[in-house]
């Protein structure tokens, strides 16, 4: 019916009367056809009718509203779902209460932010269209409930975050109608040329992509990770299936750092193998950064930092034959919010039975952060040749000298062959040579 019924009836004089509380809730009838009646093409005087108007046994009702039984006509319009959806967050707090929509003590426990201005739900994530639809009405209803003393906070939501759209190619035929994107082959649909557009993925543009194919090819964790890695969460981002391979490889490398694929055995060393000092510092820099990035919803940057740490673990495995448990376990815990299925499997392989959901996020070692040097990979014309360790305050000239003094770099290039040294602070140093 596109919404909840108004608890209103009309008397014989067509005057509205509220249904008393003892007769609530008003239950909607079961009907065979929910479609509304629209204007008749051949009758200019016709009027549209809601589907409830055809439920005559429900519409005409005899009620005793305090002055004896009388016949009334029920309101056949409905509230367009706002009445139910605008306060759902309050009902979620106390869904089993059959006397109140929420217990006041329960509402205060969850919604009161300890004196912080506004209070309300900690975080609301929704599209920008919600601002003029659901959020507008939810805020109105909440303020009414606050004025009536039923809720403890003047605002329903403490923080609002608008996520961007996922965009995909959409196609229109010569007359401008959208055609199924999946059925376009070589720029044509059923033999006709089409025009390509980039638009919001969805039914209206017929350019939706089923996640089932991604699940089958790469698994659910890869899809989750790819969506978070596409770019800032609040930006519109184009769907690029070829990029899925990159995050899939990250998860594969993480798996291989923990599990020997030939034997199926865990390849993580016990407490006897300590991480190198640079790897230990990088671990705690990553913990500190990813903790903050998760709180800021900057998942794409967090994935980049986790990838860098995992690459460092890969090099450690290559050089020393095993991954240090002291690094791998925090890495798995940090990956868990993004790739929960793989993380849970790895956690069990590491010998743990406790669910990851019950564990605290890793804590960074303040000393490692305070004295942290910066480890920079060094490439020559884009090819990795080693890494250097510099102080966190090292200037460009110091980084340049250290990079050019690195053994493999010094053997490959002389000072006269260096065209320029590109330093991306905290990330990489690339030595570009003259042709």
Model regions and ranges:
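A broad, low-specificity signal for short, low-complexity segments enriched in glycine/proline
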Residues: 215, 268-270, 339, 393-394
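Membrane-interfacial helix termini and the short, flexible loops that connect transmembrane helices
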Residues: 150, 269-273
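C-terminal, low-complexity/hydrophilic appendages and adjacent surface loops
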Residues: 264-266
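Basic, alpha-helical terminal appendages of large translation-related enzymes
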Residues: 30-81, 86, 95, 201, ...
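Short amphipathic alpha-helical leader/targeting segments
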Residues: 174, 178, 212, 268, ...
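Structured secondary-structure scaffolds
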Residues: 1-262, 279-314, 326-335, 431
